[in-house]
Regions:
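Periplasm-facing N-terminal accessory domains of Gram-negative outer-membrane beta-barrel systems
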Residues: 37-126, 183
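Bacterial Sec-dependent N-terminal signal peptides
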Residues: 1-48, 63, 90, 792
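Acidic-histidine catalytic/liganding microenvironments
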Residues: 82, 165, 666
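Conserved aromatic beta-strand anchor motif in extracellular beta-sandwich/beta-rich domains
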Residues: 65, 192-194
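Outer-membrane beta-barrel proteins, especially TonB-dependent receptors
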Residues: 122, 127-153, 172-180, 184-185, ...
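Short, well-structured beta-strand/strand-turn elements
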Residues: 72, 166-176
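Active-site-adjacent helical/loop segments in soluble small-molecule enzymes
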Residues: 162
């Protein structure tokens, strides 16, 4: 039966005049496909649902076909039947409270059989480990990057890969540095979990990209908004979770090789993976993975950008063992990159800097006529090592005990241009981190509730000068040496029925940070200052299944974040950002109160999801450009002239909407629309905030062919001009809005996957408001990439 979708009274989306007709025209086309007739839909699909552990039949399991109205519930014998299905390729989903959901792809021609074996749901709402698919059991707004969409973006940085998910954008420093922005928040307010461990680097910097090789993980999920109390209350923006596939448990050796070429920058990427078990040693598994990347100067629509190459050399090793009662795994990775910083962002005097900002095109000295692969100064040279051990033990009372310990070393060198033959223009950051977690996971607190409790600890030492944290030698570093300790305690309880789920969690953190700065350069007298912060975070999430087609969820949460060392103590030139940054040691901790609501509705061939959120942050800390009476303020140093940015504290309100709607025109043709809108307001000073993402709209279409998993897809990305900026609050006006056309295609031939992607196909010249180098140059022009992957 086809269900009609009616416009709800009172709903109105206000658009600027120059884009109203474009949106209306698209929506008319989009919704007109709803009347397509169905024919020849005679197929039947049946199967059984049981538990994986003891093979018991599971009644009441929800089984549905994604993108259709075909859904049912397993009967008392665990059997399900779906009838009147059109022939074609579908994604079949089975879910049940307290079990991990399962997705599988089926090719249906007449009558099909598909059985499911469900595993106990060991992870909880707010700390779901990524499985590369839609996580049904979460009360947080979330997005996933998986399957074909993930494959299309292989070879890109993590920040660039996530850009395009609803509610997620990218903060850039030129074309080579990118980091995720979730609902307008980024850096220290976004936790990145790599292999289940908090990634600890110099993530406070807008130009400090995550030190992660995305090839190390096949599954990526973004939880939007405060959540994941297990991992820290400071995730006011959200969490990016990366997890690999489980280690193999058979002795057979498998692997893959991926070769990718990007035309823009003439960048080559080579990544390989090899995994297997140990012969005659049941339970053991291992994996080795590595990536190489090499690229030169990036090209805009009209010119090359000097010194914008990138190089990467990454490797990771994993070893694990599992039995019926316990399991353990070891993991080690090394990430190394050298990133060129656009030379036009480091200028020697005020007049040249102001001229560079005002020109529509960079000075000729910074736009070479030919492609250059060599990376010169200024640049970033970054090394990141991560070693982790994790153990799991199943207790007799059906509870479990988990322990994780990790060591990380992050070494960052930022080299400025040489001036007057002196080699003093260098920043060094060396961050060593030891962290751990002990978790007691109660499978059943009683017949109705289940929960978990545990504590986390973190110990860090940050060195910018001298051999040790306690023995600094220089007073001229951007940051002083400092040590940091953080201890957190958390508890989460969850109850689930067939119709609804409820989760309540609380966390308490105490953080101590102590600085070490010499009285003068190379002075034996060390001045120490100590700051202690503590705060409570908590959340309540409720999810309700209205029927087989509709579910809604609401979350109310409070998050606490202590100031970071950069926000408290910065005072100097930040080479990578091309800015002079000044901190404030009197800053207080942030507290955020967030309310989010989302609904997922799947009538007929539709899949519609809308999320609303409102995040009020007291004592919000942000980096603001110094402007007095409309005139920019600059710092003149021996390193050159740089715009001044200061850390300030206000009360802020972030509100927005994420919308994603797709329609299955036929089993082979799908269209989709995505919308991301965020509004940020300084309620203390009654004005808009700077550096907030502009409205973003995406229109996509995909057609899949019958053979070899071949497909073609295309889309238009529209980013509006950011008009909600106070006059005179920045060094230049926000750039104009823009449209980008992107094309994709792929095919599988035996063990080979071949795909082509064209980004910015029309070679548009544009500048993005979230690119800190928009003052100086255009963004990247057309980029054609080709990937060949071999799996064995």
């Amino acid at each position: 039966m086809t269900k009609n979708i009616r416009e709800k009274d009172g709903f109105r989306l206000s658009l600027s005049p120059n884009c109203q007709m474009k949106h209306v025209f698209f929506l008319l086309i989009f919704f007109s496909f709803n009347g397509f007739a169905q024919s020849n839909c005679h197929c039947t699909l049946k199967g059984f649902v049981s538990t994986k552990e003891n093979k018991e039949k599971v009644p009441g399991a929800y089984v549905y076909i994604k993108g259709t109205n075909k859904a049912t519930v397993s009967d008392s014998k665990g059997q399900f039947i779906l009838k009147d299905i059109c022939p074609g390729k579908y994604t079949l989903v089975c879910q049940m409270a307290s079990f991990d959901p399962i997705e599988t792809v089926i090719n249906l021609e007449d009558e099909g059989q598909e059985d499911f074996q469900l595993s106990s749901h060991e992870e909880h709402l707010q700390e779901v480990f990524v499985q590369g698919r839609k996580q049904e059991n979460t009360s947080q707004l979330n997005s996933q990057l998986n399957g074909e969409e993930r494959s299309q973006k292989d070879g890109l940085s993590l920040g660039e890969m996530l850009k395009g998910l609803t509610g997620v954008q990218s903060l850039q420093t030129g074309s080579t540095v990118s980091k995720p922005v979730i609902h307008g928040l980024h850096s220290s307010r976004v936790i990145i979990l790599n292999q289940g461990v908090r990634q600890e680097g110099q993530n406070w910097g807008s130009e400090h990209a995550p030190e992660i090789d995305p090839f190390v993980s096949k599954n990526i999920q973004v939880i939007k908004g405060p959540g994941g109390l297990r991992y820290g209350g400071d995730a006011i923006g959200g969490i990016v979770m990366l997890e690999p596939n489980a280690l193999p448990d058979s002795s057979a050796i498998h692997g893959s090789i991926q070769s990718i070429y990007f035309s823009n920058g003439r960048q080559g990427v080579l990544s390989g993976l090899l995994e297997g078990g140990i012969p005659r040693q049941n339970g053991w598994g291992w994996r080795i993975q590595g990536t190489l990347k090499d690229g030169g100067n990036v090209q805009t629509a009209n010119y090359y950008l000097s010194n914008t190459g990138v190089k990467e050399e990454n490797v990771s090793i994993a070893l694990g063992y599992k039995s019926n009662r316990w399991a353990a795994d070891l993991f080690y990775s090394r990430f190394h990159t050298v990133i060129g910083i656009y030379e036009g962002s480091h200028i020697g005097n005020i007049s040249d800097l102001e001229r560079s900002i005002s020109l529509p095109r960079p000075l000729p000295a910074f736009t070479p006529l030919e492609f250059i692969r060599k990376i010169d100064r200024p640049n970033q040279d970054v090394w990141h090592d991560l070693a982790k051990i994790k153990a799991y033990y199943k207790l007799p009372n059906r509870a479990s005990l988990r322990a994780t310990a990790a060591i990380q070393s992050d070494e960052r060198w930022e080299l400025d241009v040489l001036r007057a033959g002196k080699n003093i223009n260098t920043l060094r950051f060396n961050l060593d981190t030891q962290s751990g977690e002990i978790l007691y996971d109660e499978i059943n607190t009683n017949k109705r509730w289940k929960g978990q409790a545990g504590f986390t600890f973190l110990d860090q030492g940050n060195i910018t000068s001298g051999p040790k944290v306690q023995n600094p030698t220089l007073t001229t570093s951007l940051l002083p040496n400092y040590s940091l300790q953080n201890i957190g305690f958390f508890a989460i309880e969850r109850r689930a029925t067939e119709r609804w789920e409820l989760e309540v969690g609380v966390r308490y953190d105490i953080k101590e940070i102590e600085t070490h700065r010499p009285k003068a350069n190379f002075s034996p007298t060390i001045i120490r200052n100590r700051h202690i912060y503590s705060g409570t975070s908590g959340s309540v999430g409720f999810k309700y299944h209205w029927n087989l087609l509709t579910e809604s969820q609401v979350t109310v949460s409070r998050a606490f974040r202590a100031p970071g060392g950069n926000e408290l103590f910065s005072n100097g030139v930040h080479h990578g950002a091309g800015a002079y940054e000044i901190g404030d040691p009197n800053l207080k901790g942030e507290t955020g109160t967030n309310i989010s609501f989302s609904t997922n509705y799947k009538p007929d061939r539709w899949d519609i999801e809308i999320g609303l959120y409102s995040n009020h942050i007291h004592n919000f800390i942000y980096l603001r450009p110094e402007v007095i009476n409309g005139d920019a303020v600059y710092a003149t140093t021996v390193r050159g002239v740089f715009p001044i940015f200061t850390y300030q504290q206000i009360d802020a309100r972030f509100q927005g909407v994420d919308l994603q709607a797709s329609y299955l025109i036929s089993p082979r043709l799908t269209i989709q629309q995505k919308t991301s809108i965020v509004r940020a307001y300084d309620t203390m000073n009654d004005q808009f905030m700077v550096n907030i993402p502009a409205d973003r709209f995406e229109y996509l279409a995909r057609y899949g062919f019958k053979k070899n998993n071949a497909y073609v897809s295309g889309g238009i990305t529209q980013v509006s001009k950011q008009t909600r900026v106070e006059k005179g609050s920045d060094y230049s006006e926000p750039p104009a809005g823009y449209y980008l056309v992107n094309l994709n295609g792929g095919i599988t031939i035996k063990h080979f996957d071949i795909s082509i992607r064209v980004s910015n196909a029309l070679n548009a010249a544009y500048r993005d408001y979230l690119n800190r180098f928009r003052y100086y140059a255009d963004d990247q022009g057309r980029n054609i990439s080709m990937k060949v992957a071999y799996t064995f």
